[in-house]
């Protein structure tokens, strides 16, 4: 992404309703689908300005990768975590080391999404899991996606196909950012009709509005963790390596969590 996008992210990711609400949803998902209850070794790929690291540290120790120099320096200063630079598959990582690898709105930036997941698979310890969050609904493609250097938006089927091709078995897949979907669709289509680029989406609204949107979005965690939303602006997915894929254990070997 461009430098100004990271700078803007650094300004808003602590308080903006989308970032706060998403962290609440992902916290619920991790509480339900982490591979075990004790402290985990976690890798965040594409940590950006570090807004997710404190949330992830609730579940264990966190390593992180971020290729952008500005974002990496900002994240390291704000979190105290040593963050590796570079791009997959060239970043040196230990094999069979991590209990949890997360890519939170990152996979859509990577031209070879399957190749990236294949490179990460052997880095998971036995029983380890992969957690993804990605933008959904290709029909919502807009100037916002272009500004953020997205390669694609996913459907449930295209995301699962990439995950399967990379050697993973899906344990839970859920849409989220569902309650605000009608409003977001309306704004995106209005911006398209008026030729706007959609930059207002990265601004924090007035405090009462921001507070309400934070509450509404974050409240989805109770439904999203069960995979009950049929559609949404985003998709989250939890997966594990399949038998013979070179890492971890398959669902047939006891690594699968309860499926609701």
Labelled PLM ranges:
Residues 168-178:
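Conserved S-adenosyl-L-methionine
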Residues 10-11, 130-152, 156-164:
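Short, glycine-/aromatic-enriched active-site segment of Class I SAM-dependent methyltransferases
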Residues 180-244:
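A C-terminal cap/extension of S-adenosyl-L-methionine-dependent methyltransferases
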Residues 1-96, 100-104, 115-117, 202, ...:
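Conserved N-terminal segment of class I S-adenosyl-L-methionine
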Residues 114-129:
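A short glycine-rich, Lys/Arg-flanked "PGG" loop and its adjoining helix->strand segment in the class I
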Residues 105, 109:
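A short His-aromatic
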């Amino acid at each position: 992404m461009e430098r100004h996008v990271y700078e803007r992210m650094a300004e808003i990711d602590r308080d903006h309703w989308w970032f706060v609400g998403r962290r609440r949803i992902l916290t619920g998902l991790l509480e339900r689908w982490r591979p075990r209850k004790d402290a985990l070794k976690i890798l965040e790929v594409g940590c950006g300005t570090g807004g997710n690291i404190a949330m992830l540290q609730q579940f264990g120790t966190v390593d992180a990768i971020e290729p952008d120099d500005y974002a990496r320096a900002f994240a390291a200063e704000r979190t105290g975590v040593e963050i590796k630079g570079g791009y997959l598959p060239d970043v040196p990582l230990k094999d069979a080391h991590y209990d949890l690898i997360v890519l939170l709105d990152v996979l859509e930036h990577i031209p070879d999404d399957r190749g990236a997941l294949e490179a990460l698979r052997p880095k998971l310890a036995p029983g380890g899991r992969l957690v993804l969050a990605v933008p959904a609904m290709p029909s919502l493609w807009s100037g916002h996606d272009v500004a953020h250097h997205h390669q694609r938006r996913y459907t449930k089927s295209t995301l699962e196909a990439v995950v399967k091709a990379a050697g993973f078995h899906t344990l839970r897949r859920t849409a989220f950012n569902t309650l605000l979907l009608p409003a977001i669709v309306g704004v995106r289509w209005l911006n398209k009709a008026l030729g706007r680029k959609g930059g207002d989406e990265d601004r924090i609204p007035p405090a009462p509005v921001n507070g309400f949107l934070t509450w509404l979005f974050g409240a989805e965690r109770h439904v999203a963790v069960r995979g009950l939303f049929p559609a949404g602006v985003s998709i989250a997915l939890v997966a594990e390596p399949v038998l013979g894929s070179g890492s971890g254990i398959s669902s047939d070997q006891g690594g699968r969590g309860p499926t609701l």
